[in-house]
C-alpha cells in the first residue's frame, strides 16, 4: 500500500526555477567570505569534525543536526535590513531605552549554558535528542535565548539587557512552527548593596523607577496578588516589599511594550479593513516557569480572542548567585519575534520569513509605517499519505516540546526557584529503540524543506494479533512561490518514504 495522495494540476510557468536539490550527504556549503563550511560523510556516517563559521567541533553519537539546519545559521534574519523580524525587534527595543542589546551571540552553546545554568533537571525532556539539536553530548544549538542569561548576568555590563537571537528546536511541521525561529528576552536587575550604600530601601528605589515608565490608558485585568504562597510563591531571601515593587516594574514595562506593538498592528489593520475600533485590553495570568518565581503570562484581547503574548517573572535567585551577582534581584521576560511579527503584519505562514522572493520582502521597510502583508498568491496544495509499521521493539512517543517553556524566562524543577542549581552530571547515551514523532518531522524537513506546509498524524492502530503499531501521516506539500507538479511531489515523497525506512527502520504499508 503506497498511501493516498492528491495534487491539483500544476502551472509551472508561474515562476521559473527548479526544486532545491536534496542533499543526502552531510554537507553544508559556505561562501569564500565565511558562512558554514562542512564536508565529508553521509548522514549514516556522521563526520567526526565539522567547521561552522570558522569554529571547529568534534561530533559523536549524539550528533543529530542535519545540514539543512546548519545552513540556517548564517541567515540571521533578525539582523537583515527591512526584514519584518528586524522591524519587530527594533520596535520592541525602542520601549527599553538604556538597556544593552545583544543581537549577534553565536548559536552553538554548551549543555551547561543551555540547561545546567538554568536549573534544568537531568531528566528534563528538553535535553532529549528528540527535542534538541546536538553536535556532541556537550554541545547543542541553543533552544532559547536564555542559554546566554547567566553569562550576561555575570558580565554585569548594565542594569537592563535585551537578547535577540535565532533558536533551534526539533518540533512539529505546520504554519506556525519552524525548526529555526527567533526569540527576544529581556531582564532588569537592581543592586541591594548599592541601595545600602545610598542608605535607601531597595523597594523604594524600584518604585521610583516605576514612576519613570510611560503611562498608558488601556484596560488591564490583574486580579491576583503579586505573589501567592501556593500558586505563585516568593523565593527564599526575597521580601514581599521587594517582589511587589519588582512585579510592578515588570508589568508596567511590558504593558508599555505591548501597547506599542498592538497599536502598530491596529494601525496596519485599519488601513485595509473597516472593522469597528475595539479598545485594546490586556490581562495578567499566573503561570509556572522553572527559572522565575513568581511568574506570569501576559495576554492581549485581539480580534475577538485572548492571545498569549509572553511569559515573565522574578528571576530565580540561584541563577544570579551562580552568575557571581548574588547581590542583585530582578525580572526577566521572553517573547517570540515570529509570533509578534505574524500579528503585526498578518503573515499567515512562518515559512514566509525565510523567503527571498521580492514579492514578500518588498512589502516591508523600516522607513515606512507598518502595513498589513498582502499575499502574492495561494498556490495549490498537494497532500500525500505515508503508512508504516513500527519495529516490533519500538514504542511510540509524540512531540513533547518541553523546552518550549516561555521564551527567555524558565526551566522545569518545581523547587528550582529556591534551591541551588545542581552541577552537571554524566548524561546517558542516546537511545534509538523508541519511535518519536519529531524524527518523522525532521526527515520531512530534510527531504522537502520549505516545500512541506505541514505533517499530521491522521491514523494509528495496534494489530490485535501481532501487537504491532501502524502509523499514518499526511504530508501537505505546497510551494509558497509557484505550483508544484505531480512529478516533483512524487519524487520528494519517494525520498521521504525511503528515508523513513533507512533512518527509523519502519516497514512501509
PLM regions: where:
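N-terminal targeting leader peptides, primarily classical Sec-type signal peptides for secretion
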Residues: 1-5
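TRNA-recognition modules of translation machinery and tRNA-sensing kinases, especially anticodon-binding
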Residues: 7-454, 458-467, 472, 481-483, ...
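Conformational-control "hinges and anchors"
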Residues: 475
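Positively charged, low-complexity, intrinsically disordered RNA-binding extensions
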Residues: 478
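Short, highly charged C-terminal tails/helix-capping segments
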Residues: 506-509
Amino acid at each position: 500500500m503506497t498511501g493516498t495522495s492528491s495534487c491539483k494540476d500544476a502551472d509551472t510557468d508561474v515562476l521559473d526555477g527548479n526544486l532545491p536539490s536534496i542533499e543526502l550527504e552531510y554537507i553544508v556549503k559556505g561562501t569564500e567570505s565565511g558562512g558554514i563550511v562542512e564536508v565529508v560523510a553521509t548522514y549514516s556516517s556522521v563526520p567526526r569534525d565539522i567547521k561552522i563559521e570558522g569554529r571547529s567541533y568534534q561530533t559523536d553519537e549524539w550528533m543529530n543536526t542535519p545540514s539543512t539546519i546548519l545552513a540556517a545559521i548564517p541567515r540571521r534574519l533578525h539582523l537583515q535590513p527591512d526584514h519584518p523580524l528586524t522591524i519587530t525587534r527594533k520596535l520592541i527595543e525602542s520601549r527599553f531605552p538604556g538597556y544593552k542589546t545583544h543581537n549577534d551571540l553565536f548559536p552553538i552553546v554548551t549543555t551547561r549554558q543551555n540547561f545546567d545554568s538554568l536549573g534544568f533537571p537531568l531528566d528534563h525532556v528538553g535535553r532529549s535528542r528528540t527535542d534538541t539539536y546536538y553536535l556532541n553530548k556537550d554541545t547543542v544549538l541553543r533552544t532559547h535565548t536564555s542559554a546566554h542569561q547567566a553569562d550576561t548576568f555575570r558580565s554585569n555590563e548594565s542594569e537592563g539587557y535585551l537578547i535577540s537571537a535565532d533558536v533551534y528546536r526539533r518540533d512539529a511541521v505546520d504554519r506556525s512552527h519552524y525548526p529555526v525561529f527567533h526569540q527576544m528576552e529581556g531582564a532588569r536587575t537592581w543592586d541591594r548593596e548599592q541601595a545600602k550604600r545610598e542608605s535607601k530601601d531597595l523597594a523604594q528605589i524600584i518604585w521610583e523607577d516605576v514612576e519613570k515608565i510611560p503611562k498608558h490608558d488601556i484596560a488591564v485585568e490583574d486580579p491576583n496578588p503579586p505573589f501567592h504562597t501556593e500558586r505563585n510563591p516568593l523565593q527564599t531571601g526575597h521580601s514581599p516589599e521587594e517582589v511587589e515593587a519588582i512585579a510592578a516594574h515588570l508589568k508596567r514595562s511590558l504593558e508599555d511594550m505591548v501597547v506599542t506593538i498592538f497599536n502598530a498592528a491596529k494601525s496596519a489593520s485599519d488601513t485595509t479593513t473597516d472593522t469597528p475600533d475595539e479598545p485594546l485590553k490586556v490581562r495578567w495570568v499566573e503561570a509556572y516557569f522553572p527559572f522565575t518565581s513568581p511568574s506570569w503570562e501576559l495576554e492581549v484581547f485581539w480580534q475577538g480572542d485572548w492571545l498569549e503574548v509572553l511569559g515573565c517573572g522574578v528571576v530565580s535567585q540561584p541563577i544570579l548567585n551562580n552568575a557571581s551577582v548574588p547581590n542583585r534581584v530582578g525580572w526577566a521576560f521572553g517573547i517570540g519575534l515570529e509570533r509578534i511579527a505574524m500579528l503585526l503584519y498578518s503573515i499567515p505562514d512562518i515559512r514566509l520569513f525565510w523567503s527571498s522572493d521580492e514579492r514578500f520582502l518588498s512589502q516591508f521597510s523600516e522607513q515606512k509605517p507598518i502595513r498589513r502583508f498582502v499575499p502574492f498568491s495561494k498556490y495549490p496544495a498537494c497532500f500525500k499519505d505515508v503508512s508504516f509499521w513500527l519495529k516490533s521493539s519500538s514504542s511510540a512517543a509524540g512531540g513533547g516540546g518541553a523546552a518550549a517553556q516561555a521564551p527567555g524566562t524558565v526551566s522545569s524543577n518545581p523547587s528550582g526557584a529556591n534551591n541551588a542549581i545542581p552541577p552537571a552530571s554524566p548524561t546517558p547515551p542516546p537511545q534509538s529503540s523508541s519511535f518519536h514523532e519529531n524524527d518523522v518531522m525532521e526527515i520531512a524537513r530534510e527531504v522537502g524543506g520549505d516545500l512541506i506546509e505541514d505533517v499530521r498524524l491522521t491514523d494509528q492502530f495496534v494489530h490485535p494479533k501481532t501487537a504491532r503499531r501502524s502509523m499514518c501521516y499526511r504530508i501537505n506539500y505546497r510551494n509558497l512561490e509557484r505550483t508544484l507538479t505531480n512529478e516533483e511531489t512524487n519524487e520528494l515523497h519517494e525520498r521521504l518514504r525511503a528515508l523513513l525506512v533507512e533512518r527509523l527502520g519502519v516497514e512501509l504499508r
